[in-house]
């Protein structure tokens, strides 16, 4: 009755989903106007301390869901004073924003120069860096809902592959890249570089949206431009800042799978509907044995999702920065580390960890030196070290196997005394061994990947007032290096088929 035979091979792998949960239970609506009662479109409204936010419509209206009555709504708009309002027991919160004269005197980075905001005529939106400090190690996930005209979405919650995609003022082309131009301290970088930035290191974050603002970037700025400048040292004694975070991650929604008995009954009903005279695949004995939890080797009842995935995971992030300096030189140093893990269960039968585990360390150093009264030099150094541990297949493939796997065909592995004399796991299968066994696919291997990115930058600024007042020269040179090393280890699972069954 039951034995092994038919040794088979198969390959699959796993990665997983991990999204921050945001509970939403209170609906707050309202209207935002200026002191003359004119509606303000594009006002950013956020639940303080979260990424939950919306922008007002052209009529100044908004609707936002919050968790509790103690939540604080943050209203911010360029040229106006920001306001914080506690929801309390209010369902309608109307706000009058007051103009900010100081903000018009603030400096705005515009392509290759800086201007006062009151002289900028292009469409440029700025985001307060403090609003980007959410419980996530991926900066791109902080951009959703921050301003009008930006579409931001994620296609995966898998750690390491969870970069948000974003468009500025919609999709501009269906046949070419739609990503905006991203500049950090004047250098073009990728979405990955932006994703790895620490919010604590950002001095300003601006988005140029129209042709006037992006004209100096030519065709490369057709999809909009994101400008980021990092913090620099200030004269004075050294100031030290430290921040540590723990965050809880879980799927926002999971599928409910039928148990083995319900699956077999519904399968038989579907068969009768198609052909009432056809023999049923699952006999009464098979259904009865499964329902009464008899020998799991003969009557398996496997919830593949529960076997592979955890309910939640914990992530950690820390940042330490120091800045200071004297009359001649100023410095800003920052060191950060983050750890993101996935939802895969680590099986005790394995002597390795194939769950996603990403450790990332960032080092940033900005040094400004005043060589003479008219000559300044800036040296900027950035490096990120990342170690990725995890399975070597895509989340879509593995999750697809979980969705397709039959809960009653075979167990994840056969459990017999002394393992029937074999020194390896007896993974279950059926027929010719070609059925997907998601569990075997998950535990059969892992990979380690080490990456290191270094970006060095030197800027020279020379005041040329002796030629004509206001004339300056600025030169910039940079070097970027990238290194990667990957090790993969896996084995071929031994699949076993039960040849005799009492069904």
Where are each of the predicted segments found?
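Flexible loop and strand-edge segments within Gram-negative outer membrane beta-barrel domains
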Residues: 251-253, 296-336, 340-344, 354-435, ...
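Surface-exposed, low-complexity/disordered Ser/Thr/Gly/Pro/Asn-rich loops and linkers
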Residues: 439-441
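Cationic, amphipathic, low-complexity alpha-helical segments enriched
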Residues: 497-503
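Outer-membrane beta-barrel pore domains and translocons
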Residues: 243-247, 336-338, 382-384, 461, ...
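Short loop/turn motifs that connect adjacent beta-strands in outer-membrane beta-barrel proteins
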Residues: 233-238, 327-328, 374, 463-473, ...
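Short, small/polar-rich motifs associated with maturation and membrane association
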Residues: 2-11, 20-364, 376-377, 430
């Amino acid at each position: 009755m039951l034995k092994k035979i038919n040794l088979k091979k198969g390959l699959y792998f796993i990665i997983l989903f991990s999204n921050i949960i945001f509970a939403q239970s209170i609906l707050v609506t309202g209207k935002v106007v200026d002191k003359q009662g004119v509606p303000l479109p594009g006002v950013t409204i956020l639940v303080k301390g979260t990424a939950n936010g919306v922008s007002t419509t052209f009529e100044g209206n908004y609707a936002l869901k919050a968790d509790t009555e103690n939540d604080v709504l943050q209203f911010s708009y360029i040229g106006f004073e920001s306001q914080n309002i506690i929801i309390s027991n209010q369902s309608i919160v109307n706000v009058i924003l007051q103009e900010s004269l100081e903000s018009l005197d603030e400096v705005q980075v515009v392509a290759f120069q800086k201007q006062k905001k009151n002289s900028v005529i292009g469409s440029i939106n700025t985001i307060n860096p403090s609003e980007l400090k959410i419980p996530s190690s991926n900066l791109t996930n902080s951009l959703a809902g921050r301003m009008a005209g930006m579409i931001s979405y994620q296609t995966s919650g898998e750690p390491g592959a969870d970069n948000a995609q974003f468009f500025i003022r919609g999709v501009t082309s269906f046949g070419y890249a739609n990503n905006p131009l991203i500049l950090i301290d004047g250098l073009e970088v990728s979405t990955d570089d932006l994703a790895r930035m620490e919010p604590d290191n950002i001095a300003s974050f601006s988005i140029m949206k129209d042709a006037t603002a992006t004209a100096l970037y030519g065709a490369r700025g057709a999809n909009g431009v994101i400008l980021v400048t990092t913090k620099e040292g200030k004269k004075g004694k050294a100031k030290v800042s430290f921040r540590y975070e723990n965050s809880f991650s879980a799927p926002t929604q999971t599928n409910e799978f039928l148990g083995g008995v319900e699956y077999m009954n519904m399968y038989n009903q579907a068969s009768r509907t198609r052909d009432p005279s056809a023999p049923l695949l699952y006999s009464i004995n098979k259904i009865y044995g499964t329902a009464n939890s008899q020998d799991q080797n003969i009557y398996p009842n496997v919830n593949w999702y529960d076997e592979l995935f955890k309910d939640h995971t914990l992530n950690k992030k820390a940042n330490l920065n120091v800045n200071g300096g004297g009359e001649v030189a100023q410095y800003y140093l920052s060191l950060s580390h983050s750890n993101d893990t996935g939802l895969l269960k680590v099986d005790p039968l394995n002597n390795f960890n194939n769950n996603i585990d990403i450790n990332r360390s960032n080092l940033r150093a900005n040094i400004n030196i005043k060589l003479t009264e008219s000559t300044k030099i800036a040296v900027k150094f950035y490096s990120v070290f990342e170690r990725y541990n995890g399975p070597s297949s895509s989340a879509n493939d593995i999750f697809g196997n979980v969705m397709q796997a039959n809960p009653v065909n075979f167990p994840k592995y056969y459990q017999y005394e002394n393992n029937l004399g074999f020194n390896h796991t007896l993974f279950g299968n059926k027929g010719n061994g070609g059925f997907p066994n998601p569990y075997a696919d998950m535990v059969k291997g892992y990979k380690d990947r080490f990456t290191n990115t270094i970006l060095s930058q030197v800027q020279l600024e020379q005041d040329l007032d002796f030629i004509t007042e206001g004339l300056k020269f600025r030169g910039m040179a940079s070097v970027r290096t990238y290194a990667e090393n990957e090790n993969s280890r896996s084995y071929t699972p031994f699949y076993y088929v039960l040849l005799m069954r009492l069904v």
